[in-house]
Amino acid sequence: MSKEELVKKLTEVGINGEWINPDKYGFSRTFQFELNGQIIKIEWFCNYSTLMIGNAHFWFDRISTYSGYPMQGEWIEFSFGNEKPLHLKVKESDKE
């Protein structure tokens, strides 16, 4: 997944952030955003990336903006290979 594809997927569900800690050439691998008051970072590489929430780190190589997670609200799903996905709630349901 390219850096542009990563940002596009996050933007589709209303997640806006910024590339932080650029090197001396202006290149950054770390995308940071805030979700529900918590700072979340993604360390990007084209073959897989790492989602970092505090001390918890999750590898992923796919992002789905259509999550089948059975809880109310809008969710984004991060998955790696055939492993179980990680679901992040990005928006409360209108019914909640």
Annotate the PLM regions.
Residues I20-P85:
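Acidic, low-complexity, intrinsically disordered interaction modules
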Residues E92-E96:
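Short acidic DE-rich linear segments
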